[in-house]
Amino acid sequence: MSQAPAKTTDETSTVDIDSAVEAILGAIEQEREREIITRRFGLYDRKETLEQIGELLGITRERVRQLEKAILVRLKIASDEGKIPAVQSVEKVLIRELSEMGRLATVADLTKALLGDKATPLSRARIAFAATLAPRLTVINENDNYKNAVGIAEYGDEKKLMKQVDAVVAGVKKHGQPLTIEELHEQLDHEHPSHVRALASVSKHLSNLKDLWGLNKWPTVNPKNIRDKIYVILLEKGSPMHFSEIADSIKESDFSRKDVTTQAIHNELIKDKRFVLIGRGIYALDSWGYSKGTVADTIIGILKKSSEPLHRDEIVKRVLKSRQVKETTILLNLQSKPQFKRVAKATYTLAEEK
């Protein structure tokens, strides 16, 4: 079986995108119309609002909107009729790339796939502009729910793709906790997990961390502060950790802004109710069932639950289930604290309150 030819530099270089955009702009006869398009799409600098362009050109923002719409309609018709070859060239490259990315991708991911480290905000803007004019591509415009994305038109228009993205978000919500793309794919009616991943990537309501996807508000996939990062580290470890070990794990993680001090970690562990101190500098998640408070508090809780006095060995055994402390510390508490009363050899109960 013959292998597909590797991509050449000419096929995906920044120069090709730049040349294509210049060729497209060359199809716009009036300079003022070119000005509107370049500024609205940010083809040479940052994107500008209708109002900003209107002030520059001395026309109303509504007039700018009308002109932009009319220009794009003309360009799309010309592209559809094959009169702007540059659009067809870019379209061909984008469709080939999208076919490998699940038929849909954010403009940021698509540009990175094409240009690698050469991807810039300017190249993203130019690819998005060219895609807008390509008849075989669908563009999802950015808003509060969706990222700017490009899809293969054969598989859906903007409305259909948005609906599919919404279905992925609904699937995550229904599951109620982070899950892998493969698990999500089993819940949804799509041909391949890569398409589910592509749809999930377009939503502004989802985040992913270490191959797990979930809602933005879930700290396990979108840790926003030090406390959330501590929570994720402990959850991944699955067992109690010393605060210095937690700090080291955060520094070695894939988190953004992971330059933290050991003291900062310790301070956050103390403040957050999700974390329980169970030994000297050792913390666990509250959800694991470890008890809070002092060793004496833990012993009191154990004796209160018991219907009869307990032997010290049994007390030690039960304390160690919820605390990481030395056995001698437990015995010292039993022998020295006034809350406990020995009723037989090595057997204790709670002292009667006076």
Where are these regions (language model features)?
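C-terminal non-catalytic scaffold/interaction domains in large multidomain proteins
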Residues: 1-354
